C-alpha cells in the first residue's frame, strides 16, 4: 500500500511517469480485454436483473439512463477509441500526437444518445486516457489537458441532427483546451524562434488534423448513410 501510494504521489505531485504507468502502456491489450470484460459483465448483470424483475413496462421517468443496448454500444465505442488512441501516426515530443480518428467513436455515441450519456462516456474515455500515462504539473494544467479536453467530446450530443457540427465542436473545444494549457504552462519549451502563441497553436494542431480526417470519413456517402441507419436502430431503445 505504501509503495502504491508513493506511485500515486509521483503521478499527481511530481509530474513524473513511474514504472507502473510504463507497464500499463506496454500491456494495453490486456487492459483493453479487462475493460471490455468488465463492460460485458455489467451488461449481463443488467440483463439478468431485468429478467428477474420481469417488469413488462418501465415508465419514462423510471427508465435508467443506460439500458442494455446503450451500455453495450458505449463499451464498444470506448474500446475502439481506446485502441485507436494507442496508435500514434505522429508522436509529438512534448505530448500529444496524431491518431487514426480516435475521438470519432465517442463522438458517434454522443451524437446518437445525446449530451447526458455523451458526457458520461466521454468522462469514461478521459479515465481510460490516464492509463496511457499522465503528466501532472498542477491542477489547472491537468484539468485543461485531460479532464476538460476529453470530457468535452460529449458536446457532440447537443447536435443530434448534425454530426458534422458536433464533430467540429468537439475537436475545436479540445484543441482550445490544449492550447490554453500549452500557453499557460509549456511555452517555455518553445525554441523555434516564433512567438509563443503561434507555437502553442501550431503544436496542438494535431487535433485539427484529426478533425479533418473525421470530417472526411463521416462525409463519405456510404459511411454517412450507415451512421444514420445505426442511429435510427439504436435510438429505438430510448423512445
Model-derived regions: residue spans:
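Loop-helix junctions at membrane interfaces
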Residues: 1-239
Amino acid at each position: 500500500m505504501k509503495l502504491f501510494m508513493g506511485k500515486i504521489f509521483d503521478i499527481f505531485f511530481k509530474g513524473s511517469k513511474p514504472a507502473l504507468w510504463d507497464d500499463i502502456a506496454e500491456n494495453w491489450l490486456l487492459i483493453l480485454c479487462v475493460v471490455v470484460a468488465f463492460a460485458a459483465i455489467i451488461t449481463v448483470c443488467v440483463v439478468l436483473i431485468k429478467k428477474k424483475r420481469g417488469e413488462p413496462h418501465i415508465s419514462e421517468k423510471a427508465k435508467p439512463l443506460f439500458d442494455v443496448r446503450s451500455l453495450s454500444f458505449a463499451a464498444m465505442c470506448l474500446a475502439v477509441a481506446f485502441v485507436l488512441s494507442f496508435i500514434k501516426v505522429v508522436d509529438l515530443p512534448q505530448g500529444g500526437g496524431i491518431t487514426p480518428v480516435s475521438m470519432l467513436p465517442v463522438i458517434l455515441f454522443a451524437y446518437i444518445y445525446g449530451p447526458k450519456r455523451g458526457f458520461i462516456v466521454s468522462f469514461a474515455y478521459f479515465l481510460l486516457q490516464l492509463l496511457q500515462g499522465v503528466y501532472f504539473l498542477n491542477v489547472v494544467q491537468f484539468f485543461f489537458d485531460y479532464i476538460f479536453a476529453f470530457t468535452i467530446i460529449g458536446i457532440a450530443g447537443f447536435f443530434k441532427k448534425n454530426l458534422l457540427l458536433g464533430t467540429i465542436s468537439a475537436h475545436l473545444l479540445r484543441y482550445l483546451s490544449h492550447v490554453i494549457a500549452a500557453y499557460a504552462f509549456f511555452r517555455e519549451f518553445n525554441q523555434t524562434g516564433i512567438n509563443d502563441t503561434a507555437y502553442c497553436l501550431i503544436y496542438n494542431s494535431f487535433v485539427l488534423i484529426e478533425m479533418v480526417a473525421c470530417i472526411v470519413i463521416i462525409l463519405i456517402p456510404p459511411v454517412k448513410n450507415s451512421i444514420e441507419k445505426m442511429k435510427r436502430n439504436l435510438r429505438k431503445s430510448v423512445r
